[in-house]
A protein has these predicted regions:
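Tubulin/FtsZ superfamily GTPase core signature
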Residues: 1-206
Length: 206
């Protein structure tokens, strides 16, 4: 299994650099099973941190690291309902463009908020709408409620294709305390007509 995770240049880097990146992405698509594309320009929608010229590229590199680590963690970390390499392969092998989102939230509506963040990641150009292959992993402390898990999983299922292969996993992490983390990897949505890039999702303050 070969998964590519790449960034596209900031707009200020110029049209020529963007064209070179687009050409490289098209070539890379023929050499990987799945490809996650993160446009640097969308970083401004995805963080409350002030983005300066000095730290812009550092933030972009950290986003890449988080994307790769999220996939790696699903494979290597043992969960209560475990996801493994075979599950990741089932969704990402020969799958083309991929959506990968992680949401983390606390408070009364934490399950809904975390799931929506994962589904509508402001960093990506892809959309989970109509996805035909989905991995969803819900992580919380030992006292996470069954209803909260159901809410998060159902929101992901509703966004995917009715006949999608959905593989569900769950894990415990007491360091999250009152928070829930939802990780979503989705593929098989390239044929969806009219799919639009995701808009940022903001959870209301509790």
């Amino acid at each position: 299994l070969t998964v590519g995770v790449v960034t596209k240049p900031f707009n200020f880097e110029g049209r020529r650099r963007m064209m070179q990146a687009e050409k490289g992405i098209e070539e890379l698509r023929t050499r990987v099973d799945s490809l996650v594309i993160i446009p640097n320009e969308r970083l401004k929608f995805a963080t409350d941190q002030k983005i300066t010229f000095a730290n812009a590229f550092e933030i972009a590199d950290d986003v890449l690291r988080q994307a790769v680590q999220s996939i790696s963690d699903l494979i290597k970390n043992t969960g209560f309902i475990n996801l493994d390499f075979a599950d990741v392969t089932a969704v990402m092998q020969n799958a083309g463009m991929a959506h990968m989102g992680v949401g983390r939230a606390g408070g009364k509506n934490k399950a809904e908020d975390a799931a929506k963040m994962a589904i509508s990641s402001p960093l990506l150009e892809t959309s989970i709408n109509g996805a035909k292959g989905v991995l969803v992993n819900v992580t919380g402390s030992m006292d996470i409620g069954l209803e909260e898990v159901e809410i998060a999983a159902n929101l992901v299922q509703q966004a995917a294709h009715p006949d999608a292969l959905i593989i569900f996993g769950a894990a415990f992490d007491d360091t999250l305390e009152d928070e829930i983390r939802v990780t979503v990897i989705a593929t098989g949505f390239e044929e969806v007509e009219g799919a639009m890039p995701n808009k940022p999702f903001s959870a209301a303050a509790e």
